[in-house]
């Protein structure tokens, strides 16, 4: 893994302290669940000015009814990237899967995320906004675990700025890899039998 600097997350007061950052990370990414569902869900954006979220049809799924989309804490690391950055991830949900992940990918982490090397400089410079919502306003989406939808206009409870994307992965103990092309690692993830997710792959280098 690359040597990473300490993550910085800030709100409208400016850069916050390490203790405040740790509390934000604990609150946001180890969110408690009620009856198997999270208390809070999240949306990540490069736009920090969104006051309310209006249902829309996602370009990647034009047959889906208009909805506001959010994710739980387990899915969050998939979105600690610049929006257009192709990225892939594989992870373990239990002890058996962890043993397989460790064997196949030579890691001690429970999740691996990977992106193309050409995105490393942008990862260092970029910042994104984390919008937090009350999960009771959403319903689980049947298409994927950890994703939630609402047909209503939703106002976020809070928004934070994440200005160290590399540091967020490090703080969450996510192994972050960079490779010139994702194809071979994608094939290994597909063949692993483990949970995986690919995002913005249509923009990946061929």
Please place each PLM-identified region on the residue numbering.
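Conserved NAD+-utilizing ADP-ribose enzyme module
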Residues: 2-31, 35, 81-206
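Short, surface-exposed beta-edge/turn micro-motifs
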Residues: 37-40, 64-68, 74, 126-128
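Short N-terminal edge-element motif at the start of the domain
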Residues: 13-63
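Extended catalytic/binding region for NAD+/ADP-ribose chemistry, centered on the ART fold
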Residues: 62-86
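Small-side-chain structural scaffolding
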Residues: 44-45, 70, 77, 151
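Short, flexible beta-strand-to-coil junctions
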Residues: 43-49, 72, 133-137
């Amino acid at each position: 893994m690359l040597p990473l600097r300490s993550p910085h997350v800030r709100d409208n007061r400016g850069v916050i302290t390490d203790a405040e950052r740790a509390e934000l990370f604990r609150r946001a990414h180890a969110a408690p669940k009620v009856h198997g569902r999270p208390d809070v869900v999240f949306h990540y954006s490069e736009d920090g000015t969104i006051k309310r979220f209006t249902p829309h049809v996602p370009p990647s799924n034009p047959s889906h009814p208009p909805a506001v989309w959010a994710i739980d804490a387990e899915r969050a690391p998939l979105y600690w990237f610049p929006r257009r950055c192709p990225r892939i991830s594989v992870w373990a949900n239990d002890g058996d899967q962890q043993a397989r992940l460790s064997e196949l990918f030579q890691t001690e982490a429970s999740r691996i995320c990977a992106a193309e090397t050409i995105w490393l400089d942008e990862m260092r410079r970029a910042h994104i906004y984390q919008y937090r919502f009350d999960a009771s306003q959403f319903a689980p989406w049947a298409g994927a675990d950890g994703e939630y939808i609402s047909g209503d206009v939703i106002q976020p409870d809070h928004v934070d700025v994440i200005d160290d994307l590399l540091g967020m992965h490090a703080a969450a103990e996510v192994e972050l890899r960079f490779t010139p092309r994702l194809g071979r690692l994608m094939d290994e993830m597909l063949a692993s039998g483990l949970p995986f997710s690919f995002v913005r792959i249509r923009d990946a280098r061929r």
